[in-house]
């Protein structure tokens, strides 16, 4: 099977969400879903808001990134999470 690399864009619920804690939570979530976290970064957006990007590496399988994306969206401090890039390696 092929390896999939995905870039997930995560928007926190507010600027008050602790950035480093959110990044650590996302990294743990990825690793608990049979995937590797290849990196977590953040970019300022506006008015104190920021976007977190998570690079995920996993084996190609049925359902793909859906379980990880759904788990990220279910987190308390996450407004939205969506896969913005996907490629096979």
Swiss-Prot record:
The keyword Translocase does not apply. It comes from the Archaea. One of its GO terms (molecular function) is translation elongation factor activity. Gene3D superfamilies: 3.30.70.60. Keywords: Elongation factor, Protein biosynthesis. Pfam families: EF1_GNE (PF00736). InterPro entries: eEF-1beta-like_sf, EF1B_bsu/dsu_GNE, Transl_elong_EF1B/ribsomal_bS6, Transl_elong_EF1B_B_arc. Belongs to the EF-1-beta/EF-1-delta family. Promotes the exchange of GDP for GTP in EF-1-alpha/GDP, thus allowing the regeneration of EF-1-alpha/GTP that could then be used to form the ternary complex EF-1-alpha/GTP/AAtRNA. PANTHER family: ELONGATION FACTOR 1-BETA. This is Elongation factor 1-beta. It comes from Methanococcus maripaludis (strain C5 / ATCC BAA-1333).
